[in-house]
Curated annotation (Swiss-Prot):
Gene: tsf
Keyword Cytoplasm set for record: yes
Location (main, coarse): cytoplasm
Keyword Cytoplasm: yes
Official protein name in the record: Elongation factor Ts
GO cellular component: cytoplasm
Compartment annotation: Cytoplasm
Keywords on record: Cytoplasm, Elongation factor, Protein biosynthesis
Classification via Gene3D superfamilies: DNA helicase RuvA subunit, C-terminal domain (1.10.8.10), Elongation factor Ts, dimerisation domain (3.30.479.20)
GO MF entries: translation elongation factor activity
Amino acid sequence: MAVTMADITKLRKMTGAGMMDCKNALTDAEGDFDKAMKIIREKGQAVAAKRSDREASEGCVLVKVEEGFGAIIALKCETDFVAQNADFVKLTQDILDAAVANKCKTLEEVLALPMGDATVAQAVTDRTGITGEKMELDGYMVLEGATIAAYNHMNRNGLCTMVAFNKKVDEQLAKQVAMQVAAMNPIAVDEDGVSEEVKQKEIEVAVEKTKVEQVQKAVEAALKKANINPAHVDSEDHMESNMAKGWITAEDVAKAKEIIATVSAEKAANMPEQMIQNIAKGRLAKFLKEVCLLNQEDIMDAKKTVREVLKEADPELKVVDFKRFTLRAE
């Protein structure tokens, strides 16, 4: 039977596939819409299989809050061109709407949700067949709370955050905290949310860094005392190039190497342990100030911390939790 433009348009609305794909599917299915949809779906599965090893680094990230339940989801693809496509954004929004309406707690639950005559997982595969790009759902996060603030950074669908509070909060203040999470990327609400493993690792790194700095200071002081510029002998390459320039002599280099070896060994063997630990603890405190939301300088008023801003608004107001997802490596 002849395929009409009306039939092609109808199938396109049903599947989102291109006009030529719809025409070919209807032709192969001899006008049977169910068979045509199956053909398009099978094409999507075939394309998805071929694209499975490709990297999907672009996409659309959206956030939604409804009746004390919030969720972030990302539908990823290969190119920004597809990510900006209205149908792609709509599919992401439709999936998020369904996830929030059903209060899904996991990505697996989202993928199993019904969508049209299939599932969310199948809808994503179908879209792969239409665009020819690998697609996958990622970054599904949920929050529940008395009040949840949501923020889509600059409405560009690339970075979204949610913040849950223990009670009703001023809308502008809530958005400000959600923006803080987007801008400053904290890893925990406060120190209690940072694992002991992370704290211990930071202490170990700080101790080693401090020891290296103490040795370096001692070496530089000894070199200066010997009338040798530390910058001229801080590496083998510098020693050679600076000798070639006539800035130092071979005797200077030999003397510098002896000083570096001797002073480094002596300083390492006589390191003031208590001082090292104190400096390391100070560096841990600085780290916790930078990565804990409540300890951070407020993005709207650097003279105050987020904790102070919240306390001024309401002494009983607390941040319960937050979520953040971005497509970009940071």
